[in-house]
Amino acid sequence: MSRLSGDLVRHKLATRIFGQNIICIDQIGSTNTELKALAGKGAPAGFLYLANEQLAGRGRLKGRKWIAPPDSSLLLSLLFRPTDVVPPPQAQQLTMLCALALIDAIEQQTGLRPDLKWPNDLVWKDGKKLAGILTELEIEDNRLLWVVVGIGLNVNLDFKKQSELDNAYGKSGNGGPPLFQTATSLSMILGRDTSADRLPILQRFLEKVERRYEALEQGQLFHQEWSRHLVGLGEPITVSGPDKTYKGMMLGVDENGALLLKQNDSSIETILAGDVTIHW
């Protein structure tokens, strides 16, 4: 069975907190939007909001969408309450934690090990996007009240069936280039049906998130490990920011998730937001 449910996810799930409270819905606009509302009403840490189809998922930048046909992807949002664990500037540690947990879960289930593209994508070796992460949070009195990490992973989806996807969802969901030029999925990489992999990947992901979050509570940070997975590490890149374009060599990220760029004059620029182009 490819359709996920709360009972299926909890069955044999080896966690104490993460994924023990679940809402699973067949079709939704955005899992992040729904879980943020629940977070504001007191939903407990580890709460999982899961969907089998997403119609209006949001990307990191305004106007970008994450849209997925039924039962094709892992579409989830996970709630953290890290008030006494990390300060607001380090909220991206939770994004990194989830990205690393997802990489490990994918590798354990399929043998594939994706790379990371700053600031929030999992990509395959050809640079095509495999998963996206969107982190949203609430701060009060300089403390994190809650953090919602949303993830969309392309599991069993053939982007080469372009006309079918365009008719249903529009080009790239954003009016951009054809999806098969920019995105990929586990099924496309492996050359087989991967619908049965959604559940075990999700369960392994939740278990690995819990272990990594326990390490975070003990003071472990993940930016150095995260940096080692970065596409373009040690390579010349261009970063197109909101107000400025930067060029230099990628050094990794700092504890706040900011990109560290060594410029031609050997100075180090810290960049909080932007899109990376790698010059191979």
What are the functions of these language-model segments?
Residues 1-108, 195:
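N-terminal lobe of the biotin/lipoate ligase/transferase fold
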Residues 121:
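Conserved active-site carboxylates
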